[in-house]
């Protein structure tokens, strides 16, 4: 049985809205990553209000233990989205898309060797949207840590430079 996914490729019908939102950020000299963090925070607040038994308002996370529990839950959700992403790379319009990550499937080599560019545009978008689903949960972890886009950039910049230095030093 093929796993059921949200079919997100059709969301691109609203691409003009997304492009306009990006332009609005840039025109306002706003960091688009900060806008994404704010959008995700608002979603989590809404979920906490609608379904308080299973969702928390990230603004209420105060202790290291609460943040740990939150991050562990996000990692569980990411793990699910990772598997969906792997399956989507098999092409959701194909009869056995999970053959790409199941080496015991007869179609395994065929699916692994298929060029991404050979997938239909819709299948390519599904794979990309599954990756975006993971970003939602990474953003939740960022929110829990109280980070913004500027801090993320600066810390990433420093860590990336360190990673290059390590490689130059035989790491």
Description of each model-found segment:
Residues 1-171:
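Flexible "arm" and connector segments at domain edges
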């Amino acid at each position: 049985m093929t796993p059921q996914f949200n079919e997100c490729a059709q969301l691109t019908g609203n691409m003009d809205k997304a492009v306009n939102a990006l332009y609005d950020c840039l025109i306002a000299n706003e960091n688009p990553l900060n806008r994404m963090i704010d959008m995700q925070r608002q979603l989590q607040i809404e979920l906490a209000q609608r379904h308080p038994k299973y969702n928390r308002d990230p603004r209420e996370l105060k202790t290291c233990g609460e943040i740990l529990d939150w991050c562990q839950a996000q990692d569980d959700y990411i793990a699910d989205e990772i598997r969906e992403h792997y399956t989507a790379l098999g092409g959701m319009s194909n009869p056995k898309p999970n053959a790409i990550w199941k080496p015991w499937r007869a179609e395994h080599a065929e699916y692994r060797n298929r060029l991404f560019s050979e997938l239909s545009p819709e299948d390519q978008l599904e794979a990309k949207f599954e990756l975006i689903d993971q970003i939602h949960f990474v953003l939740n972890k960022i929110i829990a840590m109280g980070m913004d886009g500027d801090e993320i950039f600066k810390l990433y910049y420093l860590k990336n430079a360190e990673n290059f230095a390590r490689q130059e030093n035989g790491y």
